[in-house]
Amino acid sequence: MKRLLLSALIALLPAGALAQELSGKLVLYTSQPNTDAQQTIDALKAKHPKVDVSFVRDGTPRILAKLRAEFEAGQPQADLLLIADSVTMEGLKKEGRLLPHEGADIAAYPAGTHDPQKHWFATKLITTGIAYNTKALFKPASWADLLKPEAKGQVTMPSPLNSGAALIHAATLTGNLEGGWKYYEGLKANNAVAGGGNGDILKSVAGGEKLYGVIVDFMPIREKAKGAPIEFVFPKEGVSAVSEPVAILKNTKNPEAAKAFVDIVLSKEGQELALKQGYIAAHPAVALPAGYPSRDAIKVLPFDAAKALADETKNKTTFADIFGQ
């Protein structure tokens, strides 16, 4: 009888009344732009107003260097990471630095967008394709088009030695295109230039210094919307992608709040925020931003983060040998 009465009383409680109210502090280390990071934090605070979140924003290599220094000092400060690429996350997982979130709801997400053991989770798909100036002699539709005589000396791209996205792109293309590294040998033979970051590529192609550029999608798409003479294509063979994964550090002092942050980022509402910010959301049911084709028209090539981590030094050496860097 007492059990029945208790069950009845529980049923009358408002939803969430039995759940522990989250509070305390969280520190997020992120490579997101400041505005994007704050909007993500605001989404958490809308549901959990007693959680106080601060963030440190920098490029992924500098974030990692900061973490390394803190690990060595025995004083890690971050609870959460939201950075550019899964290869970095895979390295931290291998070192035992990440806390798995076994309760994360990833039912809607395809394989490859998260760690199978739930240590990290993709939040976006930032693909790399081909931008071209509207004065270019032809509209590229294939990666092979950058090897055409008409493109000789007119191709620019970030170097995998300096850009994480470019390193993932190289690993993806050489792992999927027939001939592997012969494609990069062909680019070098066609006088392609490798150096700088994606911002430099955008400036070069939009300004007409080079007619073709290998670049992340959102930069030229946004620049075109502002009136710049630039177009972007998703090559027919497929594209590489970095996924801006989120993860919880094992040293967190507030694991439940950290898990709530991950849950919100992975939720449909959190993924729609990525859409509003102008990115391709990792959630397959979320629409794409203005200026993009349909999701079905974009083929994302397979990518193995663990293999890319194991091959990182070899891939950098191979690229440097080809391009003399």
Question: Where does each model-flagged region fall?
Answer:
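Sec/Tat signal peptide C-region and signal peptidase I cleavage site
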Residues: L13-A19
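Extracytoplasmic ligand-binding site segments that recognize negatively charged/polar headgroups
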Residues: S23, V27, S31-Q38, D58-P61, ...
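Short alpha-helix C-terminal cap/hinge motif
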Residues: Q39-F55
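A ligand-binding cleft/hinge motif common to bilobed small-molecule-binding domains
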Residues: V87-G91, L211-P229, G278
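Short beta-strand->loop
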Residues: L98-D105, H119-A122, A144, Y212, ...
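Periplasmic-binding protein-like
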Residues: A111, I126-T127, E185-L187, A194-G195, ...
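An extracytoplasmic/periplasmic, membrane-proximal ligand-sensing/linker region
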Residues: G180, A282-Q325
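Mature extracytoplasmic/periplasmic domains
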Residues: S240, L249-F303
